Amino acid sequence: MPIRIDSRNADFVPRFKAFLATKREVSADIEAATRAIVDDVAARGDAALIEATCKFDRLSVDAAGLRFTAAEIDAAVAACDAATLDALKLARDRIETFHRRQLPKDDRFIDALGVELGSRWTAIEAVGLYVPGGSAAYPSSVLMNAVPAMVAGVARVVMVVPSPAGRINPLVLAAARLGGVSEIYRVGGAQAVAALAYGTATIAPVAKIVGPGNAYVAAAKRQVFGKVGIDMIAGPSEVLVIADQTGNAGWIAADLLAQAEHDANAQSILITDSEALAADVERAVETQLATLPRAGIARASWNDFGAVILVTDLDEAVVLADSIAAEHLEIMTADPEGLAARIRNAGAIFLGPHTPEAIGDYVGGSNHVLPTARSARFSSGLGVLDFMKRTSILKCGPDQLRALGPAAMTLGKAEGLDAHARSVGVRLN
C-alpha cells in the first residue's frame, strides 16, 4: 500500500522529511565500468563502438552499417499505422507552435554614455539526441527533443538509438523524420554517448547531448559533461495531484496509475484536504489496477513509492508542493488557477480536471522532458533555449573609452592585473 501521511499527526514533519529523502533508484557503482567504455570509444573510435554494439546489443555491424539509410527510414515510415502517423504529426505541429513562442530576440541599445551594448542569440551547431531503444522506445520523446532543436535552428541533429538484435520501433524512425533529425545511428548505451562527445570516423562529434537513458547513459553524460553540454540527468518519473472535495476520484486514480505504469520506480502522489476523497481514490486505484495491462509495474510503483498526504487546507498543500517540486503537478480544485499562481516549484502544471498529464505527454504542445527528483527547485523543462546560446556585445567609441577607461584602469591595478590597466591606458595616451 502507498504511504499515508497526515499533517494533523504529531509525527508529520519527520515522516514527510523521510518521504522526501526516499531514494527511488538503487544501482551498483557503475562509474568505473562506464568510464572504461567512454575512454575506449574516445581512444579507438568506430572499432570500440562496433565491439560494444556487438557485445551489449547483440548486433553485428560494420562502420558503414552504423547509420540508418534513407531507404530504411522510408520502410519504417511505410510500416507505421496511418492513424498513429497522423497523431505524431499533430503532436509535432503543436510542439512546434508552443516552442516557437520561446524564441528569444536579439537586443541592442545605447546607454547614457553612448556605449553600445547588446545580446545576440545563435543556435548550437550540432546536437546529439539519445533515444532508449528496443520495441518499447517512445516516439513522443523523439519529438519532444528534436522539435525544439529544429525550432532553435540547430543545423545538425544526430540521433542515436540502440536496436537490440536489430529490432527497432519503426515509429521512432518516423518521429525522427518528422522532427527534422539529420542523422540516425543504431548505437546506444555509454558507447553512443562517448561517440557523440568525442566523435569517431563515422559519427562527427556534437556540442550538446540531450535525451533520457539508463544508469549507464546517465553516468556517461555526467562523464562527458564539459567536453560537451548536456540537458539534465533524468530520474524516474513522478506526478503530484492536488485535489479538494470537488475532485473526481476515478479520474485522479487514472492519472496516478498513468504515471505508475512507466516504471516500478515512478512515483504518484496525492495531496488533498478531503479524507473522503483520499479513501475514494485509493479504492479506485485498486479497481483500475485489476484491468491494467501493465498492472505489475504500476502496482509495484504505487505500493513502494506512492503517497497519499492529508492536509488541513490547501495552504498547506502549496507549501508541501513546493517542497516536493514535482516533475508533473496536476491541480484539481475549485480554483486551480489561483492555487497554481502560488506554487513556485514544478516542472509542468496541468490545470483543472480536463487536463490530464497524459495530454502533455503527447499532444498538448508543451514539453514532457522535465526536471525530476526535486530538481524543479532550480531547473526547467527542455525548451528552445536549451539549444541556443547568448553572446553579449559591447562597443565603445573614443569618447566612451575616455569616460570609462580611468575606472577600468583603477580596478585593474587594484586586482594586480597591470596588463589589463595598460591595455586601456595605451588607448587613452
Curated annotation (Swiss-Prot):
Instruction: Offer one example of a GO biological process linked to this entry.
Output: L-histidine biosynthetic process
Q: Which cofactor does it need?
A: Zn(2+)
Q: Which GO terms describe its cellular component?
A: cytosol
Q: What class of enzyme is it?
A: oxidoreductase
What is the superkingdom listed in this entry's lineage? Answer: Bacteria
Q: Where does NAD(+) bind?
A: 130, 191, 214
Q: Which GO terms describe its molecular function?
A: histidinol dehydrogenase activity; NAD binding; zinc ion binding
Which SUPFAM superfamilies does its entry note? Answer: ALDH-like
Binding sites annotated in the UniProt record for substrate: 237, 259, 262, 328, 361, 415, 420
Q: Which UniProt keywords apply?
A: Amino-acid biosynthesis, Histidine biosynthesis, Metal-binding, NAD, Oxidoreductase, Zinc
* Record pathway: Amino-acid biosynthesis; L-histidine biosynthesis; L-histidine from 5-phospho-alpha-D-ribose 1-diphosphate: step 9/9
Kindly give the Pfam families that the UniProt entry links to this protein. Histidinol_dh
**What residues does Zn(2+) bind to?**
259, 262, 361, 420
Question: What are the positions of the active site?
Answer: 327-328
- Family per record: Belongs to the histidinol dehydrogenase family.
What is the protein's name according to its record?
A: Histidinol dehydrogenase
Q: Which organism is it from?
A: Nitrobacter winogradskyi (strain ATCC 25391 / DSM 10237 / CIP 104748 / NCIMB 11846 / Nb-255)
